[in-house]
Swiss-Prot record:
This is Extracellular signal-regulated kinase 7. One of its GO terms (biological process) is Golgi organization. One of its GO terms (cellular component) is endoplasmic reticulum membrane. Induction: Amino-acid starvation stabilizes protein level. Up-regulated upon impaired ribosome biogenesis and starvation. It comes from the Eukaryota. It comes from Drosophila melanogaster. Belongs to the protein kinase superfamily. Ser/Thr protein kinase family.
Length: 916
């Protein structure tokens, strides 16, 4: 039951606020509670701003807590200019000298709660959060300070994704080697789970080699948690934490262990731990982008010297898109606390250093005190009792000094104390003014009662009443603060004089002691007034007048020479007051004169500006007209140039087209002419060769062989009827049948050639080159065929003649077609000369046709090779209908004889299909 009551009382004390803090801030709700403090959301009554009020309970309980509190205040003040570090607004001390109050700017949430909610942060938000975090750490590291406690709960964030780093209780400098460190003592403790998951390996193994890489490891853990939405290494103890880290990272080398430094925990890193691929960084962050995985791997490196620095990390592709020059903030000097960071001092030294810091800030900002309770964070007013006690102690230590010296020494101490109080006080409250008035009346009564009735000076004149103050006036003039300090000094001097009078020797009379007292009091008053002279002069004339009247009313008036001097001083003050009134009366005229001068100067300046603007406008109008004309001319010129360019382009296109057509026509005409000329030459050659062949083989081409061939190769009657006109016999007496048919052949061939030339020339004009028909140039079907010769002219197959079926017969199974080239014989008694002539013509025709066919095939092969080499399509101007020829059928009945023409060799042209 007792333990429960104690715990309940402790909890109630934690929840309570100091009276001074409660009077300044309106607490709205509690935001959170930690191991060292509690945070409220509050509103400042003075500025109406929403702030975060943090109470550090038992801040000076021991040296460790005192050093933690001191570090947090010092480093927050040093880094308060950075936008990504939480700003310390104000600090307050508690009345119990144990608790401590810190006032921060208000932030809506922290990163831990944002991650815990789920998919609140998108990829761009994570990148921006990481950029701000790296930017803040870079600024901290530029001051040679490390945070050492980076975790999501220490990173504040608002709805606009603005981030601020907080909680600098574990931060420290790297300027010198430390003697004591709180992390060395509890580095291996298992109850500090919240931060263990984000600690670097060198801290887990209790290494003394602290570097800035500690914070970079924490950044990697935070980024991994944002991407994975849960911590990367959730160790249940320090050993388990090290095992999880080693499992996820690559193999540990001796160089990695040496980089951490010798420690008892380095043995854990050197152990062979079985690695599971499921817990590697690649597997845990498989859903992340490549840039994010790359940054995490670069930060989570076992060797602290190989980790990315803050300056390198801010240029990483994952966050480089947010980098801009204006955000680059660095400290160009190290942050050095007033108390050395590597030495642990007493609790009182840390407390006194912080209290002095509060006093200096109070003096600089001139803040007002909300009430005069003892729990205020401002220094209390010195009580006269304490001053008297100090004076007694001082006089007891110096018994040989004179009474004047004994009174002078405590007064100097009080003057110094009063100066300090004047700097610390921002204003005085009504309760303080009442207390001062009561004290002054008590001092006056003591000074009057100290003298005997016989030697008492005449009663002083009635003091002037104090200037009343309105209850609604909240501002207190500065001169009243100074006057209050003077009155306190007078009270201290009077109290010290009273004590001295009670202890003085019996031989000194009361009149003498009273005179000395007044003389010394006058000197001390003059000294106090001189110390506050500058502050009084800085006040407005009305406040100076009020302070002077208040001083005259409250100052004690002696009745001897001192009173005469005081009267003279009053006259001087009245004169000074009249001069101030004159100055105050003439002040408005000078002000009005100055305002008039300023107004005239302003009017002149405005007039000059208007004139300048008008001149600029006229100049622009004058310059714009020629510019418009020039622009119009240029536009017209550009249009003309465009038209000419278009016409020139069209003309060039037409010329190129006509040139191509002309070139094609010239090429086609040249091709046709060359072809005709070539055919003529070949016909002449074939004629000569045919004649030579007939002369050489006259014995072979006898009448018997010809009759045999005519019988087998006689044409049908239908074809004879179609060519009846062409096969009409010449009149008797005009040449032989062979000469008649040859002359007809030559005439018809010449006509056909002329007709084809005309057709080619006509097609050359119409560009119709697609279907050229040159079949008639090679066919010879204009000779009349012989009629069937009687069977009696054919020898028996085995008679032994030329046409017999024996091996020695040269005309066996040779079915030649001479019928198309010779006349039909009605009687077998035809003239032998005519037959010989016909046979010669037939041989000549066969030779010419064979040469033509071979040459044509040769030309076609050359033409095809040329097309294949150029890899181009066959042009229409070169296209003509190819003549298809039958292949020679192999004869399996008789051996080949070169002197024996076959039907395929002699009459192949007759079997070709008619062209369309």
């Amino acid at each position: 039951m007792a333990n429960y009551q104690t715990a309940h009382a402790q909890e109630r004390r934690i929840q309570e606020l100091d009276q001074t803090v409660e009077s300044i801030f309106d607490v709205r709700k509690r935001m959170g509670k930690g191991a060292y403090g509690i945070v409220w959301k509050a509103t400042d009554r003075r500025t109406k701003n929403t702030v975060a009020l943090k109470k550090v309970f038992d801040a000076f309980r021991d040296e460790t807590d005192a050093q933690r509190t001191y570090r947090e205040v010092i480093f927050l003040r040093a880094f308060r200019c950075h936008p990504n570090i939480v700003r310390l607004v104000d600090i307050f001390k508690a009345s119990n000298n144990l608790d401590f109050y810190l006032v921060f700017e208000f932030m809506e949430s922290d990163l831990h709660n944002v991650i815990k909610r789920g998919n609140v942060l998108k990829d761009v938000h994570k990148r921006f959060v990481m950029y701000q975090l790296i930017n803040a750490i870079k600024f901290i590291h530029s001051g040679n300070v490390i945070h050492r406690d980076l975790k999501p709960s220490n990173i504040l964030i608002d709805s606009k994704c603005r981030l601020k780093v907080a909680d600098f209780g574990l931060a420290r400098t790297l300027s010198s080697r430390r003697i004591y460190d709180d992390l060395e003592q509890d580095g291996m403790l298992t109850d500090y789970v919240a931060t263990r998951w984000y600690r670097a390996p060198e801290i887990l193994v209790a290494s003394r080699n602290y570097t800035k890489g500690i914070d970079m490891w924490g950044l990697g853990c935070i980024l991994g948690e944002m991407i994975r939405q849960k911590p990367l290494f959730q160790g249940t103890s320090t050993v388990n934490q090290i095992e999880k880290i080693v499992t996820s990272l690559p193999n540990v080398t001796k160089l990695d262990i040496a980089s951490i430094g010798p420690s008892f925990g380095s043995v854990l890193l050197s152990r062979n731990i079985q690695r599971d691929r499921r817990y590697s960084l690649d597997e845990m962050m498989k859903n992340c982008c490549d840039d994010g995985i790359s940054l995490v791997k670069a930060l989570l490196v076992l060797n602290p010297h190989n980790r990315l620095t803050a300056k390198e990390a801010i240029r990483h592709p994952y966050v480089s898109r947010f980098q801009y020059a204006s955000a680059e903030m660095d400290l160009h000097m190290d942050v050095v606390p007033p108390l050395k960071d590597h030495v642990r001092y007493d609790v009182d030294q840390y407390r006194n250093s912080l209290y002095e810091l509060i006093d200096r800030e109070t003096s600089c900002s001139n803040r007002t005190v909300s009430n005069s309770t003892p729990s205020s964070n401002r220094d209390e007013l010195p009580k006269p009792v304490r001053v008297t006690k100090q004076a007694r102690t001082t006089s007891a230590k110096q018994p040989t000094t004179s009474p004047a010296e004994r009174k002078k020494e405590p007064s100097s101490v009080e003057v110094t104390q009063s100066r300090k109080n004047i700097k610390l006080l921002g204003s005085a409250h009504k309760a303080q003014s009442k207390e001062i008035n009561h004290m002054e009346s008590a001092i006056t009564q003591v000074s009057i009662a100290s003298a005997p009735p016989a030697a008492a000076p005449p009663a002083p004149a009635a003091t002037a009443p104090a200037v009343p103050r309105k209850s609604g006036d909240k501002s207190v003039p500065k001169c009243q603060h100074n006057n209050a300090a003077v009155q306190r000094e007078l009270a201290a001097v009077a109290a010290a004089a009273a004590v001295a009078r009670r202890k003085k020797s019996s031989w000194q009379s009361q009149a003498q002691s009273q005179g000395k007292f007044h003389t010394e009091a006058k000197a001390h008053v003059q000294t106090a007034i001189q110390t506050q002279k500058d502050n009084i002069k800085d006040s407005p004339p009305r406040m100076i007048q009020e302070s002077q009247s208040l001083t005259e009313a409250k100052a004690p008036i002696p009745k001897n020479r001192y009173s005469n001097k005081m009267c003279q001083e009053k006259k001087y003050k009245k004169k000074h007051h009249s001069m101030s009134c004159i100055t105050r009366d003439t002040f408005p005229s000078e002000t009005e004169h100055r305002q008039q001068r300023e107004e005239r100067a302003y009017q002149r300046q405005m007039k000059r500006e208007l004139q300048l603007k008008e001149s600029y406008r006229r100049r622009i109008e004058a310059e714009s007209e020629p510019l418009k004309e020039t622009t119009e001319q240029e536009s017209k010129t550009i249009k003309v140039i465009e038209q000419k360019v278009c016409e020139h382009t069209e003309k060039k296109a037409d010329e190129s087209l006509s040139k191509d057509q002309q070139k094609d026509s010239i090429t086609f005409g040249t091709c046709v002419r060359e072809r005709i000329h070539h055919l003529e030459l070949e016909m002449e050659k074939c004629t000569e060769e045919l004649v030579d062949f007939v002369e050489l083989n006259a014995d072979v081409l006898n009448y018997a062989n010809v009759s045999t061939h005519l019988k087998k190769l006689q044409r049908s009657k239908e074809s004879d009827e179609k060519d009846e006109d062409d096969r009409r016999a010449l009149p008797e007496g005009i040449g032989g049948p062979g000469s008649q048919n040859y002359e007809i052949f030559r005439q018809e061939q010449e006509k056909e050639r002329q007709r084809q030339v005309q057709e080619f020339l006509a097609r050359d004009e119409t560009n119709e080159y697609d279907n050229l028909d040159l079949d008639h140039a090679y066919r010879a079907k204009y000779y009349t065929a012989y009629k069937e010769i009687g069977k009696e002219l054919n020898p028996a197959p085995d008679s032994g003649g030329r046409d017999s079926g024996s091996e020695h017969s040269p005309g066996r199974d040779n079915y030649t077609t001479y019928a198309d080239y010779f006349l039909k014989y009605t009687t077998p008694q035809q003239n032998w000369n005519d037959l010989e002539r016909a046979n010669g013509l037939q041989r000549e025709h066969d030779r010419i046709y064979g040469l033509f066919w071979l040459n044509d095939r040769r030309q076609e092969e050359k033409y095809r090779r040329k097309l294949a080499q150029n890899d181009q399509e066959e042009l229409p101007v070169h296209h003509h209908k190819a003549c298809r020829h039958r292949h020679h059928k192999p004869n399996h009945h008789a051996p080949y004889d070169h002197m024996r023409p076959t039907e395929d060799d002699i009459q192949e042209a007759d079997s070709l299909p008619e062209s369309n």
